[in-house]
Amino acid sequence: MADMPSVEPTRIDPKLLELLVCPLTKGRLEYDSARQELISRSAKLAYPIRDGIPIMLPEEARPLAD
């Protein structure tokens, strides 16, 4: 059986993270490297990062549990 290549998590440039805001609340975002998401606590949404690109569309975001 062939070994599967390991997928290294994407790293977000800290300067980019300073510039990005939640499109709904304009609040700051937190980077969750384990889940590859940008978290908006104010909107209670987690925006996915796919292939190193943050998907900042509310309809693509995952609702956060309370």
Swiss-Prot record:
Pfam families linked to this entry: Trm112p
SUPFAM superfamilies named among the record's database cross-references: Trm112p-like
Alphabetized InterPro entries for the sequence: Trm112-like
Cellular component aspect of the GO annotation: cytosol
Family: Belongs to the UPF0434 family.
PANTHER family reported for this sequence: PROTEIN PREY, MITOCHONDRIAL, ZGC:162634
Name the record gives this protein: UPF0434 protein Mnod_1613
